[in-house]
Amino acid sequence: MGAYKYLEELAKKKQSDVNLFLSRVRAWEYRQMNVIHRASRPSRPDKARRLGYKAKQGYVIYRIRVRRGGRKRPVPKGQTYGKPVHQGVNHLKYQRSARCTAEERVGRYCSNLRVLNSYWVNQDATYKFFEVILVDPSHKAIRRDPRINWIVNPVHKHRESRGLTSIGKKSRGIGKGHRYNNSPQHATWLRHNTLSLRRYR
């Protein structure tokens, strides 16, 4: 069993003494830093690698904190100018997750980079902390790598703002619901009985 497996098991048990101590110390450390700052390396390397991160040139990790809680409707003096049923201001729930917000803010901050994915790292009473994996589309190491150079294509600019990242698709409900529950029997049979020699193994 490799080292990443141990890290994964450690991360699962949030109430363990090690994790509680680490999260408390790290939350304090992250609060002292800027809202968006570059991390020298991922604080969860196993998770980052599963989501596509590689420790090589062209890949960057940014850490961000997002305030917890609902979203207040941005109306002046609480005047919504509508029927009473639509006059709510305070107890409204934002339909996208905090991780979506984190990706969007980092994407705007680093507008020359492309957002690949993100993951949760910590939270306290006020904030949630996320790390966002970004890729430099103009770096030669990225442009020459056939596994990641799809992101160089201009259609992938600001994919986080259009709900095309993993969490963005989840917020849009893609891959969920009655259409996805029962996969066709023929497709399953074909998948299990087809020899597929992939380029990367």
Curated annotation (Swiss-Prot):
Renumbered to this chain, the Basic residues biased-composition regions fall at 169-179
Q: Which SUPFAM superfamilies match?
A: Ribosomal proteins S24e, L23 and L15e
GO BP term, pick one: cytoplasmic translation
In terms of PROSITE patterns, this protein maps to: RIBOSOMAL_L15E (PS01194)
What positions belong to coiled-coil segments? none
Instruction: Say which family it is in.
Output: Belongs to the eukaryotic ribosomal protein eL15 family.
What's this protein's name?
Large ribosomal subunit protein eL15B
- In the UniProt record, the gene name given for this protein reads rpl1502
